[in-house]
């Protein structure tokens, strides 16, 4: 395949054109007064979004060199979204600003490598300053404010996320689903829930809810199929004498064993319920062990030399209450020791750090949540499907932002934190003039998020930025109301992690682009003139009439 090459300024200008076009589309969404972008879909209704990364992902150019520039900045937005969950528009605006200022310096004859070193030094200094300014995000009010800002000033979303986090804890799993009504709804599952229901409907003891409810039950965990009742006789006799109910969690319960359990349950000899173990393969073994630790029981497994015939009441776990429905089993208040549960959580966390698979990481996070707190489901309500998609995306963004805030704390929002972090650059000096220029490029670039927020709100950016820079601490400009004041008191907060990741990712990609000297792309294929020859053959069709 033949290639096309571009060098020096020509290459950088083409790249810059792509970056500018992409940034123009993304930056209109920034701030409380940012606008929507409508994205065409190959089928169905178009998507309306105010999410920077959704806009960036849709953009591709026919011009190959422009497209390269756009794709590199798209990477900035995606990486920021993946690691911090928000701040994609901020990252795009910062990347464009660093690139534009840097390109001017390179065109003026400065050394791109020294500019890059200067930018890197400045990013390090600003990052340290941001972390020093960061305040922990502990209370529900701060969490709600972070969620509100991330969801484009939608207070209902901020409030429901704060409520969900309060109920399931910082470690709990919060999932977002489509709702049925117009309002957002929150449902919380306390304790450990897994998606396996009763094996037989004859175990139901609450006809109203079609569920089996067991108060203060024993829990028998078996890592195999149970088909013979003989294996379980000693355990069943012990449970019957104690007068407490029994939940059996096994790979499967079938045949004679299931029939005997059902008959005993219906006659009231032993109050019992059987469910299949959650998961498959190694994950099933791990989840059975999780349940064992949560309920202070033992998994009966031949792998560790424990047989069902030899099981005693000491091997059984217990809980305050268990509810089994057709589809789910919920264990409430297992009697496991807190120290053992915490050790198990730490062990799963270590596995999360090591795994490279996103799917495995998600499943491990679910296991942590089930052990640590519970699961909350936010059902997003909307009038139309188009609104539902847009709102759901905002809820997910806000959720990521609040998690980031809990992780690394919060700073003043609206671009104020970056303006304050400029002070870290006052005493910073590079090894030469070109590095000093790199530091100045970043000094100017970190004003760009505030400038863009102010511009989108219809105010004069330079006036606002200068006024904010004259003051200190959290003093800033509320673009939603047009007022100046303490950003934290006004509830305008940004997660430190989001601001930090946006800056680091933007500087990383922009400085790479500045040091580019050559670009290589495939030459577009030339269409061969086959059409004319084919059409010529069609002329012979006229003679067909004579053949009839």
UniProtKB/Swiss-Prot annotation:
Gene3D superfamilies: GroEL (3.50.7.10), GroEL-like equatorial domain (1.10.560.10), TCP-1-like chaperonin intermediate domain (3.30.260.10)
One BP annotation, GO: protein refolding
Enzyme class, first EC level, given as a word: isomerase
Protein's recorded name: Chaperonin GroEL
CDD domains: GroEL
Record GO terms (molecular function): ATP binding; ATP-dependent protein folding chaperone; isomerase activity; unfolded protein binding
Record text on subunit structure and interactions: Forms a cylinder of 14 subunits composed of two heptameric rings stacked back-to-back. Interacts with the co-chaperonin GroES.
Keyword Hydrolase (UniProt): no
InterPro entries referenced in this protein's UniProt entry, alphabetically: Chaperonin_Cpn60_CS (IPR018370), Cpn60/GroEL (IPR001844), Cpn60/GroEL/TCP-1 (IPR002423), GroEL-like_apical_dom_sf (IPR027409), GROEL-like_equatorial_sf (IPR027413), TCP-1-like_intermed_sf (IPR027410)
Alphabetically ordered keywords of this record: ATP-binding, Chaperone, Cytoplasm, Isomerase, Nucleotide-binding
Pfam families, per the entry: Cpn60_TCP1
HAMAP family assigned: CH60 (MF_00600)
A GO cellular component entry from the record: cytoplasm
Role, per record: Together with its co-chaperonin GroES, plays an essential role in assisting protein folding. The GroEL-GroES system forms a nano-cage that allows encapsulation of the non-native substrate proteins and provides a physical environment optimized to promote and accelerate protein folding.
EC number: 5.6.1.7
Subcellular location: Cytoplasm
Primary residence: cytoplasm
Reactions this protein catalyses: ATP + H2O + a folded polypeptide = ADP + phosphate + an unfolded polypeptide
SUPFAM superfamilies: GroEL apical domain-like, GroEL equatorial domain-like, GroEL-intermediate domain like
Natural source organism: Legionella pneumophila (strain Paris)
Domain of life: Bacteria
Binding site residues for ATP: 29-32, 50, 86-90, 414, 478-480, 494
Family of this protein: Belongs to the chaperonin (HSP60) family.
